[in-house]
């Protein structure tokens, strides 16, 4: 059951990430908060998150994130928090970069996270 609400947020991010988030969610400076957990938005009853530029953290030789990239844990933690808060509601993560989508998808599968749908949508 979706019982969340839109809240104003002041997030630190690049202008490109902010623009992409607005492209995906239709909102600017707002987040959907469901059971205390932030999502970038909600559309047609689906909880959504927008992921911008991560390809600089991907080792082109291995096709995985660099070992020094600490954002891996943050992505996993965010996914687990969102899955719990969604309580069975569908979740979609939109990616601005196809290579990032593939790396995150592999990371999640390795960790047994399969509840999030991955969608590639190029920035406008």
Give, region by region, the residue ranges found by the protein language model:
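Catalytic toxin/effector domains delivered as secreted proteins or via bacterial secretion systems
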Residues: 1-124
């Amino acid at each position: 059951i979706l019982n969340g609400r839109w809240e104003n947020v002041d997030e630190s991010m690049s202008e490109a990430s902010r623009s992409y988030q607005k492209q995906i969610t239709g909102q600017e400076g707002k987040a959907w908060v469901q059971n205390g957990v932030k999502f970038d938005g909600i559309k047609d009853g689906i909880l959504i998150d927008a992921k911008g530029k991560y390809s600089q953290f991907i080792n082109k030789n291995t096709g995985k994130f660099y070992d020094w990239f600490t954002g891996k844990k943050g992505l996993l933690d965010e996914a687990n928090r969102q899955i719990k808060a969604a309580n069975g509601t569908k979740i979609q993560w939109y990616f601005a970069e196809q290579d990032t989508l593939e790396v995150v998808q592999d990371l999640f599968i390795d960790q047994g996270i399969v509840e999030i749908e991955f969608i590639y949508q190029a920035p406008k």
